[in-house]
């Protein structure tokens, strides 16, 4: 099956569908079409590909489960922050640490640096490549050494630069910033024998270039779906000085001639005693080929015995990580542009070309950002959407209405909107009246779908912005729900001191999203990590662990609350025990808090009132305050100062003055306060949205654990 379009058929309820056979196993990017207009579907899975949010689906191959989530010990996936000395940008990298990393504090680990392809980014190897599951499974089966794996965003564009093929000098960023950062923050084994470089497509060319340029740093090279003759020849020519230990080159069977071009070099490496060779897999230039490539490469590398664990006797000097002072304007731009699919978005397209030797020599063409601030003081925003052949295009800003875009140059549509209030705004895009997703604008999860959003800067709100303070770590952890039998994902923030003070224990806040959103909301829409970093750096907040879980739990038995699911039961039976096992918590109620917004606020009240043995601190943001209703009666606590004080150190209740629930929340707050119960209340101009909830967090976090 090639690039032909598949016509869907309308059912009787306004939906379109089609059952298709003959699709090859693997990961498949795809596009949707509305009246012939190419769009992205907001209710289908989305990843970052082709320089934007792009839909995908998976067809599992029979008997191929090496990349599946399995019941084995899971490593930790961490989102780390560093600064590029090449272009002065704040960058994020994803770092995988193996299951033993926290259990064996005296052990050092080899490091694999692995790069994405053109049009993709630092999220690709986790969400598309399933790298963490592949490593978990290989390690559990004893097929690979335990290792740290680092996944970076391989773009290092300078302003007004016009690079050919390689997107800026990312090699210098790897050598001068990334490796020093990793060596400074992780227990790494020293020496080139304990360091590998690999990549796919563009990333394979970068990997080959980096190893040729910095042969003193790497002894292992993985080239997936690529070939660089000049650099491969250079590595061979210096083999006596810098002997390679592993060189694996791979290709899909459909990448005609690539396997033989690779084999011409791998045969020469093998003649020198270098492990690896060339491998070819069913498929084309696509993720299921690269997953298999990673699996095979991970099995080969770091087989040097004890040295790979101790890192001793290399004679390599220590790396020093230092950050240059950052530009505030640049940090602000990145604050308002960051989103779950890409931390430091670039708006580019690739114009494919080849040089006289047949090597890729494409250039990068600037694209419009889907939503950009024109004048923050006037609340003026400009929307840009590419929609070739569309009849109508609209931007639907939640709470404001729809705004028609007009045709502009080169298939773009645009409009300028004034009067947008400060803060965070979800917006939808409609093409010919159909809801779609703009791949060139920030993407979040809201309304039970992928959705675009924009940021109108709040000039007097400094705490939610990226600043050059010590940065905490965001972890992606998997645990099993006893309520549903499913594996759940939670995001966990640990403060900057967590790795530096291994004997220290921390209080914990469980912080929940609202209905229609998920575990990623507080990090990307709520800017929780930025808030915590800045408040801690200013001495205004106690250092704490913050856990953000998926607030949905639907057991097959049907035993769950119709509005809040069985999440509160799951948190008690599974979530808290997992966090206390995994992190250095202070596991008592005096050092445990729960808070949430909207549905998460309702879940918070339900959970903390039912479990006084677990929590002393609570926060309800836009979730109302129930004294009594048809389901529960909390009056014996909320109207009795002595009983309240026995249970709570603090109950924080917040509601925006523009919210539909403001009057009822205010009435119940006043009744509780009139009874002499010292709840903390917070209100201000605000709607039921992330703008207000960020301010709730800013006020709530400094009050905890004091």
Task: Locate predicted features.
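Non-catalytic cap/lid and distal C-terminal segments of serine-dependent acyl enzymes
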Residues: 1-402, 407-706
């Amino acid at each position: 099956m090639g690039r032909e379009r598949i016509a869907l058929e309308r059912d009787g309820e306004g939906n379109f569908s089609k059952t298709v056979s003959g699709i090859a196993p693997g990961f498949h990017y795809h596009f949707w079409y509305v009246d012939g207009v190419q769009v992205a579907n907001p209710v289908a899975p989305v990843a970052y590909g082709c320089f934007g949010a792009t839909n995908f689906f998976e067809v599992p191959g029979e008997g191929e489960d090496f990349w599946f989530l399995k019941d084995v010990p899971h490593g930790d996936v961490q989102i780390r922050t560093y600064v590029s000395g090449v272009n002065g940008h704040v960058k994020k990298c994803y770092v995988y640490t193996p299951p033993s990393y926290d259990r064996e504090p005296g052990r050092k680990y080899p490091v694999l640096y692995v790069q994405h392809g053109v049009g993709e980014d630092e999220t690709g190897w986790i969400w598309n490549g399933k790298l963490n599951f592949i490593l978990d499974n290989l390690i559990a089966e004893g097929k690979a050494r335990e290792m740290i794996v680092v996944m970076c965003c391989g773009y290092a564009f300078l302003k007004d630069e016009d690079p050919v093929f390689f997107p800026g000098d990312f090699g210098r960023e790897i050598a001068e910033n990334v490796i020093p950062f990793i060596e400074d923050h992780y227990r790494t084994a020293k020496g080139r024998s304990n360091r590998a470089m690999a990549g796919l497509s563009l990333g394979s060319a970068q990997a080959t270039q980096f190893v040729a340029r910095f042969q003193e740093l790497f002894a292992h090279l993985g080239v997936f779906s690529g070939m660089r003759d000049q650099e491969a020849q250079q590595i061979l020519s210096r083999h006596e000085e810098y002997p390679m230990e592993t060189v694996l080159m791979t290709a899909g069977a459909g990448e005609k001639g690539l396997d033989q071009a690779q084999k011409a070099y791998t045969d020469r490496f093998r003649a020198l005693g270098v492990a690896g060779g060339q491998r070819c897999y069913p498929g084309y230039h696509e993720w299921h080929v690269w997953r298999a490539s990673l699996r095979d490469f991970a099995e080969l590398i770091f087989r040097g015995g004890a040295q790979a664990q101790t890192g001793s006797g290399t004679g390599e000097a220590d790396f020093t990580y230092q950050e240059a002072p950052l530009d505030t304007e640049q940090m602000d731009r990145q604050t308002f542009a960051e989103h779950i699919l890409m931390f430091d978005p670039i708006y580019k397209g690739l114009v494919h070309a080849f040089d006289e030797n047949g090597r890729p020599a494409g250039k990068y063409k600037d694209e419009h950002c889907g939503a950009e601030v024109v004048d923050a003081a006037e609340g003026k925003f400009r929307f840009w959407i590419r929609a070739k052949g569309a009849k109508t295009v609209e931007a639907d800003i939640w709470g404001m209405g729809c705004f028609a875009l007009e045709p502009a140059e080169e298939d773009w549509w645009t409009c300028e909107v004034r009067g947008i209030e400060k803060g965070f705004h979800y917006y939808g895009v409609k093409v010919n009246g159909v809801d779609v997703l703009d791949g060139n604008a920030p993407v979040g999860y809201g309304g039970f779908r992928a959705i675009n959003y924009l940021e109108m800067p709040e000039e007097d709100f400094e705490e939610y912005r990226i600043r050059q303070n010590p940065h905490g770590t965001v972890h992606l952890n998997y645990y099993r729900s006893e309520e549903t039998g499913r594996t759940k994902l939670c995001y966990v923030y640990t403060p900057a001191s967590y790795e530096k003070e291994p004997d220290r224990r921390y209080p914990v806040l469980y912080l929940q999203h609202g209905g229609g959103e998920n575990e990623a909301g507080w990090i990307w829409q709520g800017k929780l990590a930025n808030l915590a970093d800045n408040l801690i750096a200013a001495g205004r907040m106690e250092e704490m662990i913050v856990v953000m879980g998926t607030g949905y739990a639907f057991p097959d038995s049907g035993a769950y609350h119709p509005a809040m699911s069985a999440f509160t039961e799951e948190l008690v039976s599974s979530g808290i025990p997992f966090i206390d096992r995994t992190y250095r918590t202070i596991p008592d109620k005096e050092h445990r808090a729960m808070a949430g917004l909207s549905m998460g606020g309702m879940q918070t009240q339900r959970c903390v009132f039912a479990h006084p043995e677990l929590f002393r601190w609570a926060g309800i943001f836009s979730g109302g305050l129930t004294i009594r209703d048809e389901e529960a009666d909390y009056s014996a606590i909320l109207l009795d100062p002595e009983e309240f004080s026995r249970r709570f150190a603090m109950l924080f209740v917040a509601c925006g003055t523009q919210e539909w629930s403001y009057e009822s929340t205010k009435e119940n707050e006043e009744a509780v306060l009139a009874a002499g119960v010292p709840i903390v209340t917070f209100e201000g101009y605000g709607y039921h949205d992330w703008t207000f909830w960020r301010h709730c967090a800013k006020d709530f976090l400094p009050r905890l654990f004091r």
